């Protein structure tokens, strides 16, 4: 990840990088009143969701092995927490979130609380997105597994095929509901 505060740290010493940026990651929990818990070996408390976003962030750093990331597209970004956590260690130029219209409004409200992200992040309702080109990193944490096949194929054709790297977590089910 370009600008990943020492991308080698992410790859070789992710433990050190986690501790170095932990307080910045915890800022994710200052809005919205999430449930916070203490964890062994860590001062203070943190939400399980922020911990998962930290895990996702360092997995991406490991898999990308120092590649530059200017444009990120995330489908189904929830309230925008992964964007916030990733921004603490990755100097992306543009982050596009695509989600349901109501969720896009929530993302905008949450991410507008952080001045460093306000002008870098675009929240696009899934009913309005078009083809997006020159994507460095495409992210989907479970979102595509919640979509029907035609919707999945539309994302594939309009975004994934235009992406250098894809980080996807997908629930596989033998029965599509």
List where the protein language model places each region.
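Short, small-residue-biased leader/transition segments that mark boundaries at the very start
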Residues: 3-11
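A short SAM/SAH-binding and catalytic strip from SAM-dependent methyltransferases
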Residues: 138-150
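Class I SAM-dependent methyltransferase Rossmann-like catalytic core
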Residues: 33-64
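S-adenosyl-L-methionine
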Residues: 110-132
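A short, conserved alpha-helix within the catalytic core of class I
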Residues: 147-159
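Conserved beta-strand signature within the Rossmann-like core of class I S-adenosyl-L-methionine
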Residues: 163-173
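Conserved class I S-adenosyl-L-methionine
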Residues: 68-78
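Conserved SAM-binding loop of SAM-dependent methyltransferases across substrates and taxa
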Residues: 80-90
């Amino acid at each position: 990840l370009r600008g990943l505060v020492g991308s080698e740290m992410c790859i070789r010493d992710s433990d050190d990088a986690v501790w170095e940026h932990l307080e910045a990651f915890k800022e994710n929990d200052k809005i919205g009143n999430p449930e916070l818990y203490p964890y062994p070996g860590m001062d203070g408390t943190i939400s399980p969701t922020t911990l998962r976003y930290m895990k996702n962030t360092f997995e991406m750093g490991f898999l990308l092995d120092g590649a530059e990331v200017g444009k990120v597209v995330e489908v189904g970004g929830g309230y925008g927490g992964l964007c916030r956590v990733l921004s603490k260690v990755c100097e992306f130029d543009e982050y596009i979130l695509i989600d349901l219209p109501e969720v896009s409004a929530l993302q905008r409200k949450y991410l507008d609380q952080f001045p460093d992200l306000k002008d870098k992040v675009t929240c696009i309702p899934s009913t309005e997105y078009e083809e997006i080109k020159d994507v460095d990193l495409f992210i989907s944490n479970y979102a595509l597994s919640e979509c029907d096949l035609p919707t999945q194929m539309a994302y594939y054709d309009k975004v994934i095929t235009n992406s250098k790297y894809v980080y996807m977590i997908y629930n596989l089910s033998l029965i599509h509901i």
